[in-house]
């Protein structure tokens, strides 16, 4: 495999997690990989820390908190890669997942986007929606307990599929998205109407209109998922706003 791969992390005061994300990605990746950091106006020293400790990483200051999708879109004109990875600042890897996912796309030209298995740092699987969000799925996800996933959540997360091999999904989590760069550019990156949340659902749906989105449970990344919007009222309102924009867009789109 001789493909060029780019990756981007959008940060906003993420100095507590960004070092592990960047260091593990650079240490484990053997492919031709270029990493961008787009900083959305951090005041905790995040961009300075990256510049001082990781000179091989390209740091771009957006000039303010432009949001998740808009931050990622800032670098689309700079990309000359074959594949591109959208990465959360609280992701870490323990092996060469970048090369594995690139090899999967090499072998499956009908797939435009691949999503890996996501686990908590302690190894526990994260239950993430893989079907297109609807109100009953979102309600089940928001109010789920700590025990076994009930029927609706199992359906949303497609937990009854065969996890011994990759399978098609409707919705890929935005914490780690591996996509063909040409396709990402063709779609114009993320839809600019979402400041944060639901931009991954929207991108997944756009990709599925012209290609395939696949979940690959044979490749694993680790995510320090805190579900901030459950505790922070401002983020909760942003989440609701994005949800309404998503439903409005896809209800009336032909």
Please provide the spans of the model-predicted regions.
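Short, acidic, metal-binding catalytic loop of nucleotide-sugar glycosyltransferases
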Residues: 23-32
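Conserved donor NDP-sugar-binding/catalytic core segment of glycosyltransferases
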Residues: 95-128
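A conserved acidic beta->alpha catalytic loop
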Residues: 24, 39-48, 64
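Active-site-adjacent helix/loop segment of glycosyltransferases
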Residues: 202-205, 209-254
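Short, flexible, basic/aromatic active-site loop/helix in glycosyltransferases
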Residues: 133-169
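A short, conserved alpha-helix in the catalytic core of glycosyltransferases
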Residues: 162-164, 168-189, 193-220
């Amino acid at each position: 495999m001789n493909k060029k791969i780019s990756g981007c992390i959008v940060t906003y005061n993420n100095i507590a997690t960004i070092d592990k994300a960047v260091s593990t990605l650079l240490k484990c990746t053997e492919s031709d990989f270029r990493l961008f950091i787009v900083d959305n106006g951090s005041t905790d020293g995040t961009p300075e820390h990256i510049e001082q400790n990781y000179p091989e990483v390209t740091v771009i200051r957006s000039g303010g908190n432009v949001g998740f999708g808009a931050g990622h879109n800032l670098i689309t004109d700079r990309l000359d890669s074959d594949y591109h990875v959208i990465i959360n600042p609280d992701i870490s890897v323990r092996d060469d997942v970048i090369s594995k996912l690139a090899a999967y796309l090499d072998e499956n030209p009908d797939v435009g986007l691949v999503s890996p298995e996501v686990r908590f740092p302690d190894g526990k699987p994260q239950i993430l929606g893989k079907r297109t969000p609807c109100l009953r799925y979102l309600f089940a996800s928001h109010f789920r307990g700590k025990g076994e996933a009930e029927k609706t959540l199992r359906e949303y997360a497609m937990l009854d599929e065969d996890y011994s091999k990759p399978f098609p999904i409707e919705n890929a989590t935005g914490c780690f998205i591996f996509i063909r760069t040409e396709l990402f550019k063709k779609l114009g990156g993320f839809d600019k109407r979402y400041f944060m949340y639901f931009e991954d659902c929207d991108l997944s749906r756009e990709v599925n209109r012209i290609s395939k989105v696949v979940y690959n449970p044979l490749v694993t990344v680790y995510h320090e998922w805190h579900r901030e919007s459950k505790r922070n009222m401002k983020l909760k309102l942003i989440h609701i706003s994005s949800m309404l924009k998503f439903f409005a867009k896809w209800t009336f789109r032909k």
